[in-house]
Amino acid sequence: MTAEAPRIALVAITKHGAEQVANIAPRLPQAEVIVADKFAAAMAGLPNTVNSYSGALRAQIAVLFSDYDQIVFFVSLGAVVRLIAPHLQSKDEDPGVVVVDDAAQFVIPVLSGHVGGANAYAEQLAALLGATPVLTTASDVGKTLPVDILGRELGWNVEAPKINLTRVSAHVVNGEPIAFVQEAGARNWWTRATPLPGNIRVFERFEDVELDRYRAVLWVTRREVPQALWQALEERLVVYRPPEDQA
């Protein structure tokens, strides 16, 4: 995703999907509307930019993936999976993809839920539609830490090999003992309405952690981390770097 306002596409394939787009689009004036030619007239009067296409939607997917940060399809989940499958790269490159059913009852983040922001956008969209967000990402369902994007809204940068992020994320969602060490940065990093899970213990100094008691360490610091420490902890360490202007 870009650092600027996300580029959002609302995509309709069916008549009922187009009706849902026409209903929600005025409340999302920054979003662009993408519909088949035969539904373009129904979008007249919207404050949004409206683009229409002819032929099959599958021919438009590559451009959608290139031009937008969030793509919302108003169609069945299965149809979207088949449409986007040939274009998938990685969670670091793919846009967020969200599906809304034709009746606007359910909003489902399908792709790039965390890194691409699809989970958060699905919840926002569901609130506007009066729909149910269907989140399946383990850290969201379990109301625990999203290791790969923790502190992102505060400007924190993650420092760790990808294998560490994968391993530590698994330890967190599996409820294993986790040490969270915060030596720097803003303290309002826990944004859920629920309490911090009991398997996560907070420390103020790395030296206070008995490493043998924890499956992983999340360390918010400005200190240099010696290579020997990365090696000693193997795949158990993730470091977060807060901006210099934070405490």
Where are these regions (language model features)?
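N-terminal targeting/anchoring "stem" of glycan-biosynthesis enzymes
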Residues: 2-3, 26
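Extreme N-terminal starter segment of soluble prokaryotic enzymes
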Residues: 4-9
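Conserved mixed alpha/beta catalytic, RNA-binding, or beta-rich assembly cores of soluble enzyme
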Residues: 11-41, 46, 51-56, 60, ...
